[in-house]
A protein has these predicted regions:
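Intrinsically disordered, low-complexity segments enriched in polar/charged residues with Gly/Pro
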Residues: 1-4, 25-28, 79
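Metallo-beta-lactamase
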Residues: 2-20, 96-105
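Conserved beta-strand hairpin/beta-sheet module of binuclear metal-dependent hydrolase folds
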Residues: 11-65
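Active-site HxH/HxHxD metal-binding segment of metal-dependent hydrolases
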Residues: 56-105
Length: 105
């Protein structure tokens, strides 16, 4: 018997614009103590994504709503709550000590 669990739909992510092309993205239904801040910074030719959350819902479509530029995903460290969606992005950067995790999350 298969059971399907639905994790919140289109409102999983909360997008907060801070102005000047900087947005805070939060996983709305994740407890504060477990949720990391996901930052999207718009650039002239490409954008930066700082951390990627737990990865319980796809993040890349949310980023596409903010910008059509290529994204460089930068992970501050390799804890699961910061790298969950990094696999969705072609360019992933982070500390050398975690390079294997970023290459194959």
């Amino acid at each position: 018997m298969n059971h399907t669990i639905t994790i919140a739909g289109d409102d999983w992510y909360e997008l907060i614009s801070l102005g000047d092309g900087i947005s805070l993205i939060r996983e709305r239904y994740v407890a504060d103590w477990l949720r990391c801040n996901i930052w999207h910074i718009q650039g002239k030719h490409q954008d930066l994504l700082i951390d990627s959350g737990l990865g319980l819902r796809p993040l890349k479509p949310e980023i596409a709503r903010l910008s059509s530029r290529p994204v460089i995903a930068v992970m501050s460290h390799c804890h699961f709550d910061h790298i969950g969606s990094c696999h969705e992005f072609d360019r992933r950067l982070g500390h050398r000590a975690c390079s294997e995790v970023y290459q194959d999350p």
